[in-house]
């Protein structure tokens, strides 16, 4: 059968041809349809694989970055540790160097302190005392200024309460701590104990015309030693004598023994039995001494010993440079007693040549080659000389360049000083003045010390009469002003000062400070401070410990006050 016969009855030839053609194409389509999902699947698998590769790559990148960060941090930590170790080493090195340097400095300073021999300590104490005095003066000035000024600042401060811390830091108006001697003396008096008799003090029996007191005398068991010590300081300049021309072998003991024996031999001991000399200071380099006597009168009697032979050579007895004749005249005799037996020690009365007194002239700046006759001739051009002394070196006999003289006519003293002072003598310039002129500048201060001592003695005499009885109330007068009491802040400060200072002496039970009346009515006891103690032990210590102190620049006067009047509120007694 032919090819066409197979399709016979099923269609035309065209259909057969069509079937043949399409039959082959359908196979291809089927093949295509079968391969597409496979391709898509393979593509998907490849894409998935690539995605996984990319994810793995990203993970590896992150791991590398993390490892890098960890490594970097580790390196940073190592670097910081290294730097820290370096800093520690540097710090240790600096500290060792500093300690070594400080040790060397300390050793050097310690050696210097040993070489200075304590001079720095003395300078420090003097500086500290000067600072203390300046601070004390400043406190007095501030309190005085506060009492004179009622400024707006004070009014503003008055409205504010004072804090406890501020109160603690406030400086007390009192100038210094209570003297220990007053505390001890008062304590012994209260308990009925008599303090042991002190050694004989120089100058006992001073102020004979005003208040004679033998050494160690007391009133009612109350020691007068603080007053005696004060008078000793005030009279010391008049109780010392200058002794020049000493031998190299002289010492304090030999000088004191010699002059004590000589004073007894001539009848110059006027202060009672015992040695007239209480202290000796020797300058071995310049061969002179200051000899301190017990009394002003004995020092004046010692002036008659000028030229006496001591250890084989004559010595000069003079007044020291700080001697003030006008002030000494109020303390005792300024001239030797005319009844001294000078012949007993080989002296002739008047041998000193009249070189004492306020009209003695000092002549300094003399050329060393000037002889005694040349100097005397120069001075006598103004009048006759009552006494003359050219000071010479003991060993060489050469002039020391200065002299002393006294004119017979005392009226020419100032004329000669004015004419000769400042004259050129070769390469020297003369200095001519009264010998005591340098100390006259100290007269006001010395007189103040003397006046203060006299006032204290007179006050003690009044307060320590046999009828005076200690009470538990102490009244302080001359302490505060009316203006200070009007101001609330000032009043509070004063009250606090009194409580603090008064409490140092005993159990303080009450403090009363009367204040001015707002209506201007008179108030009893204005300007006084009343301290009430639990017993007379505390009041007695306060009485002697606060008397003479300074509060805000005012000198405190402390007296006992009747207990019955205090309890009644009567402060005007």
Curated annotation (Swiss-Prot):
Pfam families (alphabetical): RRM_1 (PF00076)
Domain RRM: start-end pairs: 239-322, 359-437, 478-564
Gene Ontology cellular component annotations, sorted alphabetically: nucleus; spliceosomal complex
Chain residue ranges for the region called Disordered: 1-175
PROSITE patterns (alphabetical): RRM
InterPro entries in the record: Nucleotide-bd_a/b_plait_sf, RBD_domain_sf, RRM_dom, U2AF_lg
GO molecular function: mRNA binding
Predominant place of localization: nucleus
SUPFAM superfamilies listed in its UniProt record: RNA-binding domain, RBD
Compartment(s): Nucleus
One of the GO BP terms on file: mRNA splicing, via spliceosome
Keywords: mRNA processing, mRNA splicing, Nucleus, Repeat, RNA-binding, Spliceosome
Compositional bias ranges of the Basic and acidic residues kind: 22-93, 106-141
Biased composition (Basic residues): 94-105, 159-169
SMART domains: RRM
Subunit structure: Component of the spliceosome. Interacts with SUA. Interacts with SF1 in the nucleus.
Biological role stated in the UniProt entry: Necessary for the splicing of pre-mRNA.
Domain note: N-terminal RS domain has a very strong bias in favor of D over S.
Name of the featured protein: Splicing factor U2af large subunit A
Protein species of origin: Arabidopsis thaliana
Gene (name only): U2AF65A
């Amino acid at each position: 059968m032919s090819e066409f016969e197979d399709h016979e009855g099923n269609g035309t030839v065209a259909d057969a041809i069509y079937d043949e053609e399409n039959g082959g194409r359908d196979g291809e389509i089927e093949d295509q349809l079968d391969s597409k999902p496979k391709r898509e699947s393979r593509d998907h698998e490849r894409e998935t694989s690539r995605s996984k590769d990319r994810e793995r790559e990203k993970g590896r990148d992150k791991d590398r970055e993390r490892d890098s960060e960890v490594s970097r941090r580790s390196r940073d930590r190592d670097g910081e540790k290294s730097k820290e170790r370096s800093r520690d080493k540097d710090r240790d090195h600096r500290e060792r160097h500093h300690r070594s340097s400080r040790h060397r400095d300390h050793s050097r300073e310690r050696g210097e302190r040993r070489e200075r021999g304590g001079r720095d300590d003395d300078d420090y104490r003097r500086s500290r005392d000067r600072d203390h005095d300046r601070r004390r003066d400043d406190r007095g000035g501030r309190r005085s200024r506060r009492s004179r000024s009622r400024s707006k600042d004070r009014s503003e401060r008055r409205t504010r309460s004072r804090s406890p811390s501020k109160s603690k830091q406030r400086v007390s108006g009192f100038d210094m701590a209570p003297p220990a001697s007053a505390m001890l003396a008062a304590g012994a008096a209260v308990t009925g104990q008599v303090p042991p008799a002190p050694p004989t003090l120089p100058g006992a029996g001073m102020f004979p015309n005003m208040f004679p007191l033998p050494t160690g005398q007391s009133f009612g068991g109350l020691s007068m030693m603080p007053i005696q010590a004060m008078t000793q300081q005030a009279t010391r300049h008049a109780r010392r004598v200058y002794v020049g021309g000493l031998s190299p072998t002289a010492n304090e003991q030999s000088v004191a023994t010699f002059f004590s024996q000589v004073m007894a031999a001539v009848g110059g001991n006027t202060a009672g039995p015992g040695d007239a000399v209480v202290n000796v200071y020797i300058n071995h380099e310049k061969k002179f001494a200051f000899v301190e006597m017990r009394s002003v009168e004995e020092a004046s009697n010692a002036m008659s010993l000028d030229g006496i032979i001591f250890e084989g050579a004559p010595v000069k007895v003079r007044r020291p440079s700080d001697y003030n004749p006008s002030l000494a005249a109020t303390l005792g005799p300024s001239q030797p007693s005319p009844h001294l037996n000078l012949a007993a020690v080989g002296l002739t009365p008047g041998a000193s040549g009249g070189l004492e007194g306020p009209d003695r002239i000092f002549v300094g700046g003399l050329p060393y080659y000037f002889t005694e006759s040349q100097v005397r001739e120069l001075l006598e051009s103004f009048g006759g000389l009552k006494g003359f002394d050219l000071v010479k070196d003991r060993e060489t006999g050469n002039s020391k360049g200065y002299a002393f003289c006294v004119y017979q006519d005392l009226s020419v003293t100032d004329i000669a000083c004015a004419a000769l002072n400042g004259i050129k003598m070769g390469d020297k310039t003369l200095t001519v003045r009264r010998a005591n002129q340098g100390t006259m500048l100290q007269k006001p201060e010395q007189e103040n010390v003397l006046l203060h001592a006299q006032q204290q003695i007179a006050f003690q005499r009044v307060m320590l009469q046999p009828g005076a009885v200690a009470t538990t109330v102490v009244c302080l007068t001359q302490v505060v002003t009316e203006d200070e009491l009007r101001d609330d802040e000032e009043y509070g400060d004063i009250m606090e000062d009194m409580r603090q200072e008064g409490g140092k002496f005993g159990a303080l039970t009450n403090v009363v400070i009367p204040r001015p009346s707002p209506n201007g009515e008179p108030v009893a006891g204005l300007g006084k401070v009343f301290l009430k103690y639990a017993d007379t032990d505390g009041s007695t210590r306060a009485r002697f410990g606060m008397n003479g102190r300074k509060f805000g620049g005012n000198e405190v006067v402390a007296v006992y006050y009747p207990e019955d009047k205090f309890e009644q509120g009567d402060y005007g007694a």
